[in-house]
């Protein structure tokens, strides 16, 4: 019997396992396949260094700037060099392995090649997690069960904490890691917003490798085929200026869904279960970035689990501490606001977004608000919105 069983060893699950193990409790960390590279752009905010100071010792690709383009290619460029700590870009296969190993070093017991598919029940109560392995089915019993296995989690549905995602609640993305000579600014990441609800990105990974991809959002998923959108994006004449070669080596490619409306408030906990990371919607509705928010959710759930175990009471009363955790409250609030901004920005073929970039190039205050909204999911002020509306 474990104190805590966690399904999923991504950023949320690994941080949660680390926190609980450091608290002196017995924790099982289950993973379906540690060699699977999660499809992702791989941009990581410098805020993550607060939770993983070990990353500073690694040779990561530093990012000190961002270039954003509206659907009509109005540009907003921003650099935070010498202002704040650099962010960085990563290959998710390597990044996830690093933070997983940190949780194992802290004392978490890791079980790879275990596909979670249901709960273990006793007297109608969920007391563990069932998995499928090459050797057969296994059961991991725990006092607290934590769902951290992403968008496609079977446990999320079986727990009844949330229903299956519908197409109008998610984003659909496709990306690739490519290699070859390029003219990208290695210090900056680039975002290319479309006239419909969607955007593309190019993130340098080193001198020659880069992550390139795109996604559609919400109802745009119905009117746009992600495979066609991807081909259109990588062949966009505007992007050719960065890529002088005729062909580039494709190292890896993948498609993936992600939650697009923020955190599902009523899906965070119940009885002896908590849900964290992508499973619970910890992805920014406006940028699609989810690594930082997922790590915060793992930290909060880990602290909450320790609180419940220390008080020898595992119930809604003790687990509600997770939802009221200060940083979780902040993320929930900010994501709700930025989700509403998505509708506003994409009105009239993205005209409001284009106007914002135009204003940001002439008004320092507007520029700072715009950057904080995209990079840190900070809600805009009423003055900011009124300025944009006045340009319509």
Question: Model segments located where?
Answer:
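Beta1/beta-strand and adjacent pyrophosphate-binding region of the FAD-binding site
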Residues: 1-10
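N-terminal Rossmann-fold NAD(P) dinucleotide-binding loop
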Residues: 13-14
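FAD/FMN-dependent oxidoreductases across multiple families
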Residues: 220-304
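C-terminal helical "tail/cap" subdomain of flavin- and related membrane-associated enzymes
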Residues: 306-392
């Amino acid at each position: 019997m474990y104190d805590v069983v966690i399904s999923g060893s991504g950023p949320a699950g690994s941080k949660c396992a680390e926190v609980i193990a450091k608290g002196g409790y017995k924790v099982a960390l289950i993973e379906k396949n540690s060699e699977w590279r999660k499809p992702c752009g791989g941009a990581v905010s410098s805020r993550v260094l607060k939770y993983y100071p070990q990353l500073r010792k690694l040779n990561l690709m530093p990012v000190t700037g961002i270039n954003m383009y509206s659907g009509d290619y109005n540009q907003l460029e921003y650099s935070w060099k010498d202002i704040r700590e650099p962010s960085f870009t990563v290959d998710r296969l390597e990044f996830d392995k690093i933070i997983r190993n940190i949780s194992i070093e802290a004392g978490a017991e890791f079980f790879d090649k275990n596909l979670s598919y249901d709960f273990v029940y006793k007297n109608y109560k969920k007391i563990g997690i069932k998995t499928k392995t090459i050797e057969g089915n296994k059961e991991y019993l725990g006092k607290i069960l934590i769902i951290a296995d992403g968008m496609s989690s079977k446990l999320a549905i079986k727990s009844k904490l949330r229903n299956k995602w519908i197409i109008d609640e998610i984003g659909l993305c496709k990306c690739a890691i490519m290699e070859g000579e390029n003219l990208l600014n290695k210090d900056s990441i680039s975002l290319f917003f479309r006239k419909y609800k969607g955007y593309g990105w190019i993130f340098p990974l080193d001198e020659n490798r880069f992550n390139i991809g795109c996604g559609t959002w919400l109802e745009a998923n119905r009117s746009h085929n992600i495979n066609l959108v991807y081909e259109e994006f990588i062949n966009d004449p505007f992007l050719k200026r960065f890529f002088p070669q005729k062909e580039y080596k494709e190292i890896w490619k993948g498609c993936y869904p992600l939650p697009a409306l923020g955190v599902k408030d009523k899906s965070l906990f119940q009885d002896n279960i908590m849900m964290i990371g992508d499973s619970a919607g910890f992805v920014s509705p406006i940028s699609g970035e989810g690594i930082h928010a997922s790590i915060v959710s793992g930290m909060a759930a880990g602290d909450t689990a320790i609180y419940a175990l220390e008080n020898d009471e595992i119930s809604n009363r003790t687990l509600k501490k997770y939802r009221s955790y200060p940083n979780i409250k902040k993320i929930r609030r900010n994501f709700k606001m930025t989700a509403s901004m998505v509708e506003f920005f994409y009105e009239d073929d993205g005209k409001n977004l284009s106007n914002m970039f135009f204003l940001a190039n002439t008004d320092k205050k507007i520029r700072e608000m715009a950057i904080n909204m995209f990079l840190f999911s900070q809600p805009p002020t009423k003055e900011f919105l009124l300025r944009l509306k006045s340009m319509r």
